[in-house]
Amino acid sequence: MISRRDLLILSGVLLAGCGRRRFRKLAAGDAILALGDSLTVGFGAPKGADYPAQLAQMVGRRVINGGVSGDTSAQALARLPDLLAQKPKLVVVSIGGNDFLQRQPESGTRENIRKMVAMIRAADVPAVLVAIPHFTTGALLGVVSEHPLYAELADELDVPLLQGAWADILGDKDLKSDAVHANTAGYRLFAEKLVGFLRKLGVV
């Protein structure tokens, strides 16, 4: 028997040829889902200083913090159906850092993100993708660059991509709590960059 998750993915694949979802301005009661890992949880900052909490204050909308520390793209994909059941009107996908740290096959990360976008579209919800740095030993020295798979997937899937945000923040020692996590100021700056990006899309 086909599972609910597989049905959502299949529906999204069939819809993928319809092109990028049209973005509309979120109503006052609409929620945003922030899907991710420890960067979404806000690891390294006090409670309430995570980027979803700061984003909620900036845009006056409810933001569901769908982050779990240590999550890989496969684990985030497995959690996504339950998060979509909360009926968000926009999903921000910021995932993949733990895949890179664990040196998981890039092909698996790509496929998991494809499935996430397909599942989100099957729920008739627009998605935006956030580029994640390719964490290597260079990150310990403050040399941070984005993994190229995000730009490639954004082009392939026709999904808006926020570039440069995490790489800029995690490349600045004043905005980090450790080599791969932001501090309060870093999460605030990410939220500000995301707000600017969403405004350009006409979402907020």
Question: Where do the language-model regions lie?
Answer:
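N-terminal secretory signal peptides
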Residues: 1-2
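N-terminal export signals
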Residues: 6-20
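Serine-esterase "nucleophile elbow" of acetyl-processing enzymes
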Residues: 19-87
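Alpha-helical cap/lid subdomain in secreted, periplasmic
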Residues: 58, 77-204
